[in-house]
Amino acid sequence: EAGEECDCGTPENPCCDAATCKLRPGAQCADGLCCDQCRFMKKGTVCRVARGDWNDDTCTGQSADCPRNGLYG
């Protein structure tokens, strides 16, 4: 929702302050295929294994999202 940096529905999330819906100090992310222990995963880390003729999707190192690369192998 507007103004939220993370989903504050789960108080046990170590990356997100459940009271403010803001990332905790030092956290880059709270969830996502490219988020590990509150930090963005390294660029090139496989976040979605290829199916068929497609290449693996990899993290950018700048976001918790796992972008589709859309390239054939």
Curated annotation (Swiss-Prot):
Keyword Secreted listed: yes
Protein name in UniProt: Disintegrin cerastin
PROSITE patterns: DISINTEGRIN_1 (PS00427), DISINTEGRIN_2 (PS50214)
GO molecular function, one term: toxin activity
Subunit note: Monomer (disintegrin).
Entry keywords, A to Z: Cell adhesion impairing toxin, Disulfide bond, Hemostasis impairing toxin, Platelet aggregation inhibiting toxin, Secreted, Toxin
Subcellular location: Secreted
InterPro entries associated with the record: Disintegrin_CS, Disintegrin_dom, Disintegrin_dom_sf
Xref: SUPFAM superfamilies: Blood coagulation inhibitor (disintegrin)
Placement of sequence motif Cell attachment site: 51-53
Protein's job: Inhibits fibrinogen interaction with platelets. Acts by binding to alpha-IIb/beta-3 (ITGA2B/ITGB3) on the platelet surface and inhibits aggregation induced by ADP, thrombin, platelet-activating factor and collagen.
Primary localisation category: secreted
Family: Belongs to the venom metalloproteinase (M12B) family. P-II subfamily. P-IIa sub-subfamily.
Domain Disintegrin residue range list: 1-73
UniProt cross-references to PANTHER family, sorted A to Z: ADAM A DISINTEGRIN AND METALLOPROTEASE DOMAIN, DISINTEGRIN AND METALLOPROTEINASE DOMAIN-CONTAINING PROTEIN 28
GO CC terms: extracellular region; plasma membrane
Further remark: The disintegrin belongs to the medium disintegrin subfamily.
Gene3D superfamilies according to UniProt: Disintegrin domain
Tissue: Expressed by the venom gland.
Organism: Crotalus cerastes cerastes
Disulfide-linked positions: 6-21, 8-16, 15-38, 29-35, 34-59, 47-66
Pfam families: Disintegrin
rRNA-binding is among the record's keywords: no
Highest taxon, organism lineage: Eukaryota
